[in-house]
From Swiss-Prot:
Record carries keyword Transcription regulation: no
Homology family: Belongs to the GerABKC lipoprotein family.
Coiled-coil segments on the chain, per record: none
Gene Ontology cellular-component annotations: membrane
The organism of origin for this protein: Bacillus cereus
Protein name: Spore germination protein GerQC
Subcellular location(s) per record: Membrane
Signal sequence, start to end: 1-16
Lipid-anchored residues (N-palmitoyl cysteine): 17
Lipid group attachment sites (S-diacylglycerol cysteine): 17
Keyword list, A-Z: Germination, Lipoprotein, Membrane, Palmitate, Signal
Biological process annotations from GO: spore germination
């Protein structure tokens, strides 16, 4: 009994000695943006949500420069009413110019911080961080909510492939596949997603334009929602819009690490919602024609994208992982060389229904 009493006393004493942080005494960063400055310095801009009476909120912005991410955060804290903490960080923005000068160091520093979560969104921009975060974009949402909602809904319901802090770091540590991140551009008082950046290790090697994101997502991610417009042959104003897209791609590798051959089979199921040419879509033959046209366009665009990946020596699909899993006596060094001359074939199978078609 005495031992239990002693244990309880010691527990209370230790809890009392633990370092505690009262929420009202700290400023919780929700968005961090990083840029480069002269002489190789790093500039960080941090958005903090501050709440007034009645639940009304406002965003405070703090910026500082330094040699490392830790120094930048510490210097920015000197300008705020309380120390800046990263426990509510939701979005991290990197300027394009910083990628070759320390992006990985910043990510590793954040990864070692136990208060930083895994589901943080990452993005690339060509805009200065301070300019981006100080924009007046939405009357209903602060910048943190606006940015995270923009990324989340496009990944869940649009053509933006899914990625986050955890996934990006895993791809850097594992040679199974190369990474990609969304790109954000600023046009007046509007932020918009403007394609994705492709990486080789921690270096950006290429960009994919928004018009190619549908097929890129088919190759790298499973579709569970989304809308896409196909331009059909013939008249310049002939289009078909599909939505409620369900899609996946099955990959099969033959041969070995020295002479690999990859089959990519894309399966798409969707509903036609709009068609700008008079056709009898009650006729199964017309539906079959549309499916074939769409399938051929997907095959063509997917083939072009994969050739680009090979030319840039980046593997966002994860074919290295496929080879390691399915090919006996896999040799990573042989693969690095053979990837430059990879042979592959893309096939696409499209199935559509005519739910609520308008012409």
């Amino acid at each position: 009994m005495k031992r239990w009493i002693l244990f309880l006393i010691l527990s209370v004493f230790l809890i009392g000695c633990a370092k505690t942080k009262i929420v009202d005494d700290i400023d919780l960063v929700q968005v961090a943006a990083y840029d480069t400055e002269a002489e190789g310095k790093l500039k960080g801009t941090f958005a903090i949500s501050a709440y007034k009476g009645g639940g009304e909120g406002e965003t405070k912005i703090y910026s500082a420069s330094g040699q490392t991410g830790r120094e930048v955060l510490a210097r920015a804290s000197e300008k705020s009413s309380g120390p800046l903490e990263l426990g509510q960080l939701r979005v991290i923005i990197f300027n394009e110019k910083i990628i070759e000068k320390g992006m990985q160091e910043i990510l590793e520093t954040l990864n070692r911080n136990p208060s930083v979560g895994n589901a943080i969104y990452l993005a690339i921009t060509n805009v200065k961080g301070e300019s981006l975060l100080k924009g007046n974009y939405s009357k209903e949402k602060e910048i943190a909510s606006y940015l995270s909602s923009l990324l989340e809904q496009n990944m869940n319901n649009g053509t933006q492939p899914k990625t986050n802090f955890f996934m990006f770091l895993n791809q850097l540590d594992d040679d199974a596949r190369d990474s990609y991140l969304p790109m954000i551009s600023k046009k007046g008082n509007v932020l918009e997603l403007n394609g994705i950046a492709l990486f080789k290790r921690c270096k950006m090697v290429d960009k994919v334009n928004p018009k190619d994101l549908f097929v890129f997502k088919l190759l790298t991610d499973n579709f569970k929602q989304g809308t896409y417009q196909f331009k059909l042959p013939g008249s310049s104003n002939t289009y078909a819009t599909i939505e409620n897209i369900k899609a996946r791609t099955k990959y099969k590798m033959e041969g070995n690490s020295k002479h690999p051959f990859v089959n990519a089979h894309i399966q798409v199921k969707a509903e036609i919602q709009e068609f700008t040419k008079t056709k009898n879509l009650d006729n199964p033959k017309e539906i079959k024609k549309l499916e074939k046209i769409m399938g051929k366009e997907i095959e063509k665009k997917a083939t072009t994208l994969i050739k680009r990946f090979i030319k840039k020596d980046t593997d966002p699909i994860g074919l290295r992982k496929l080879g390691r899993t399915h090919v006996r006596k896999w040799n990573s060094q042989e693969w690095e060389e053979s990837y430059k001359h990879l042979r592959f074939r893309v096939t696409a199978d499209v199935k559509v229904t005519q739910s609520g078609v308008t012409e």
